[in-house]
Amino acid sequence: MLTTPPRTFVSVPFFFFFLLFLSLPLSSFSQSNSVYNSFLKCFSDKTKSPQSQITDNVFSQTNPAFSSVLRAYIRNARFNTSSTLKPTIIITPRSESHVSAAVTCSKTLNFLLKIRSGGHDYDGLSYISDKPFFILDMSNIRDVSVDIASNSAWISAGATLGEVYYRIWEKSRVHGFPAGVCPTVGVGGHLSGGGYGNMVRKFGLSVDYVEDAKIVDVNGRVLDRKAMGEDLFWAITGGGGGSYGVVLGYKVKLVPVPSVVTVFRVEQYMDSGAVDMVHKWQSVGPKTDPNLFMRMLIQPVTRKKVKTVRASVVALFLGRADEVVALLSKEFPELGLKKENCSEMTWFQSALWWDNRLNATQVDPKVFLDRNLDTSSFGKRKSDYVATAIPKKGIESLFKKMIELGKIGLVFNPYGGKMAEVAVNAKPFPHRNKLFKIQYSVNWKENSAEIEKGYLNQAKVLYSFMTGFVSKNPRSSYFNYRDVDIGVNDHGANSYKEGEVYGRKYFGENFDRLVKIKTAVDPGNFFRNEQSIPTLKNEKGMLLPEPGKARRWSRVGGATVVATVVLHVF
């Protein structure tokens, strides 16, 4: 005769079934919206708003608008496919309290929170993950308040650079801000990673002009510079804001610009002096008048049915055409610049020109308010830094390699000027003493895995080819040119070592200070992504559970059972 087991034990079949029950996807119990409902209730409680008023800001996968909201700020079509893992929820906050609630509720549900402002993360780390996650889309927090009297502006994280330039233009023709040339880039990512543009040699980095900031920390608190302290303020002005919290906005100092500036573009090919021009550029671009920024574009092309390389100098001079022509006739005769190559215009119009609007003086300024949503192509970017000029034979071999590969191009951005005057630890960005930065760039339109593989391989092959010509120990990279090829972090037992691989490339010796700050402000590593700053382990070496999972403790007949409940369903 069978006897009943003591109540302090659980039979094996029942124990197994109990664990299985707890670990089954919640959709199996017709609760596919449970995560959304739990988040919505939490969000409503934290914001003290009725749920009916916030449903336009919290989107589940079943919401008809979910796909369009997700796609709007995906700027790389490689991550806009049916096989790409989708977020469980997208939050589009419209206030500081919304952001605070989003952080608190995501933390409560133990979901990874990806933070997206403009969506220009080249490898998509602000909106993709291989683990269950939410997206906090900052695009609605876009206010730009310009105060010419104090030469300053408060810029929200979700504003675009085009909107910033337009709002400055509304108030003044002789003020500007030293930031990027792509108008749809979001301020939150651009400034938190350092930020640079075509006035970098005159004024330095964008973050050199940040006077204050607001951030939501891991506890949901809204902190300004005084409240967060100088360490955290330093970290979010070049060290990537998403590792420490959610940046709400920055107060920046505006810079003076002339009423008239000059732009020009000059092209040469291999049979017309391109090698000599590129070689000489290395000794002129980083050392000439700081008012002059000359970007070098190098691209394999077919000309007259012959494969060749085109080298183009695209430039901004903060002054008149006569001045820059006279300057470069002495310093850079290989360029062959003539006055007819130049166009004079306002600084704002030059921003339009750099956005490939060649009729910039005739374009409606409001074009910079257009966010060009859901218009991405496929692409890959990588970066390098050069500390010593590449020899002429190196340029020749580079051109041959680019012709062999077929499509991938290079962009050389000169430093020097103001950049060379600022200490490498003034901000987390450590590359100020380099001659120039290289961007590897390839775009394509075909939605094909095989074609994508080929272009990604081109980027890797050219990157490998350049090893002998670029920085070493570490081989440096620019944080805002996100590149997962240089290392990723799964935030497991080896999190620090994994983070150090890419962290040293991005931040050099500043990485150590960033890790200490991260550990102090977010010891549980809630704010994380595949290339975030890691934390130092606590004394017990404790690790968090995987994102998207929560620990549930149950007692069955006196025995304690620990189970993991999967909260995300696909």
UniProtKB/Swiss-Prot annotation:
Q: What class of enzyme is it?
A: oxidoreductase
**Chief location:** secreted
Where does the protein end up? Secreted; Secreted, Cell wall
Question: Which part of the chain is the FAD-binding PCMH-type domain?
Answer: 83-257
- Cofactor binding mode and count: Binds 1 FAD per subunit in a bicovalent manner.
Which is an annotated Pfam family here? FAD_binding_4
One example of the protein's molecular function in GO is: FAD binding
Query: What keywords appear on the UniProt entry?
Result: Cell wall, Disulfide bond, FAD, Flavoprotein, Glycoprotein, Nucleotide-binding, Oxidoreductase, Secreted, Signal
Glycosylation positions in this chain: 80, 341, 359
Q: Where is this cross-link: 6-(S-cysteinyl)-8alpha-(pros-histidyl)-FAD (His-Cys)?
A: 120-182
Q: How is it modified after translation?
A: The FAD cofactor is bound via a bicovalent 6-S-cysteinyl, 8alpha-N1-histidyl FAD linkage.
List the record's Gene Ontology CC terms alphabetically.
apoplast; cytosol; mitochondrion; plant-type cell wall; plasma membrane; plasmodesma; vacuole
Per the record, the GO terms for biological process are: defense response to fungus; response to oxidative stress
InterPro entries (UniProt xref): BBE, FAD-bd_PCMH, FAD-bd_PCMH-like_sf, FAD-bd_PCMH_sub1, FAD-bd_PCMH_sub2, Oxid_FAD_bind_N
Superkingdom: Eukaryota
Cystine bridges: 42-105
Instruction: Decide whether keyword Chloroplast is in the record.
Output: no
Family statement drawn from the similarity comment of this UniProt entry: Belongs to the oxygen-dependent FAD-linked oxidoreductase family.
Name of the molecule in the record: Berberine bridge enzyme-like 19
